[in-house]
Swiss-Prot record:
Residue numbers of N6-methyllysine PTMs: K5, K10, K19, K24, K28, K37, K38, K57, K65
Any one GO molecular function term: protein heterodimerization activity
UniProt keywords, alphabetically: Acetylation, Chromosome, Citrullination, Hydroxylation, Methylation, Nucleus, Phosphoprotein
Keyword presence, Acetylation: yes
Annotated spans, Disordered: 1-43
Composition skew (Low complexity), residue ranges: 1-16
UniProt family annotation: Belongs to the histone H3 family.
Role: Primate-specific variant histone H3, which constitutes a core component of nucleosomes. Nucleosomes wrap and compact DNA into chromatin, limiting DNA accessibility to the cellular machineries which require DNA as a template. Histones thereby play a central role in transcription regulation, DNA repair, DNA replication and chromosomal stability. DNA accessibility is regulated via a complex set of post-translational modifications of histones, also called histone code, and nucleosome remodeling.
Chain positions found as Asymmetric dimethylarginine: R3, R18
Domain of life per record: Eukaryota
Protein name per UniProt: Histone H3.X
Modified residues (N6-lactoyllysine): K10, K19, K24, K28, K57
Gene this protein is translated from: H3Y2
Length: 147
């Protein structure tokens, strides 16, 4: 058994004796952080790029089906209270909506890059819509609804 350093002190009834100090060799082997391993961290942007590649490869819908369905029904309720939808119709609406949004965000990103930025801003989206001929400032059906 390896020898350890001991300190001389008077033992009292209310104090428990302390553990012996570690030897020099044991102290050298122990890491300064106490042996706790830090979790691996990727460089900023690495995970974002991985996520972009993942979603560009996939063909699945990006929006959840039930929240989208509730939104469609809520908007339709404001127009006509007794509308009913087939599930295929809501699926087609979701496909078209997601295709529109993805294309809009691509155009918005191009507008931000044109302005020598990497962060998209509302003005980029307004410019993208204006260039498409949709009109950024025009009130839409969604803009008139109190959602």
């Amino acid at each position: 058994m390896a020898r350890t350093k001991q300190t001389a002190r008077k033992a009292t009834a209310w104090q428990a004796p302390r553990k012996p100090l570690a030897t020099k060799a044991a102290r050298k082997r122990a890491s300064p952080t106490g042996g706790i391993k830090k979790p691996h961290r990727y460089k900023p942007g690495t995970l974002a790029l991985r996520e972009i590649r993942k979603y560009q490869k996939s063909t699945q819908l990006l929006l959840r089906k039930l929240p989208f369905q509730r939104l469609v029904r809520e908007i339709a309720q404001a127009i006509s209270p007794d509308l009913r939808f087939q599930s295929a119709a809501i699926g087609a609406l979701q496909e078209a909506s997601e295709a529109y949004l993805v294309q809009l965000f691509e155009d918005t990103n191009l507008c931000a890059i044109h302005a020598r930025r990497v962060t998209i801003m509302p003005r980029d989206m307004q410019l993208a819509r204006r260039l498409r001929g949709e009109g950024a400032g025009e009130p839409t059906l969604l803009g008139n609804l109190a959602l």
